[in-house]
Amino acid sequence: MSGKIKVTFIINDGEEKTVEAPIGLSILEIAHSNDLDLEGACEGSLACATCHVILEEEFYNKLKKPTEAEEDMLDLAFGLTDTSRLGCQIILTEELDGIKVRIPATTRNIKL
């Protein structure tokens, strides 16, 4: 493998955008580098929930469990689901090749 995997972002209107993403970066970093609207107000420091994304169960189950700090932030996310995670906490690995990431229509910055 060349050190890249395919990541498909599903935007709120159902539009899909598939990109090749380097292993080792976060979903938040990949979204930003591809001009996708995933806020990340705290720049990945686990101090907000604006990079909230929803994963398919298959890929959600391949990730390590969220830390307590991530769970605390997820509790504040708008539209939380059973497969919600913070994009800043999902680091790409070969095992995540083909992952689909839904970007919810709205996010909530708790600092507002």
Curated annotation (Swiss-Prot):
CDD domains reported for this sequence: fer2
Keywords recorded for this protein, A-Z: 2Fe-2S, Electron transport, Iron, Iron-sulfur, Metal-binding, Transport
Key word Zinc present: no
Pfam family, one: Fer2
Family (UniProt): Belongs to the adrenodoxin/putidaredoxin family.
PANTHER family, A to Z: 2FE-2S FERREDOXIN-TYPE DOMAIN-CONTAINING PROTEIN (PTHR23426:SF72), FERREDOXIN/ADRENODOXIN (PTHR23426)
Source organism of this protein record: Rickettsia conorii (strain ATCC VR-613 / Malish 7)
Role: Ferredoxin are iron-sulfur proteins that transfer electrons in a wide variety of metabolic reactions.
One Gene Ontology molecular-function label: electron transfer activity
Protein name from the UniProt record: 2Fe-2S ferredoxin
Domain spans labelled 2Fe-2S ferredoxin-type: 5-107
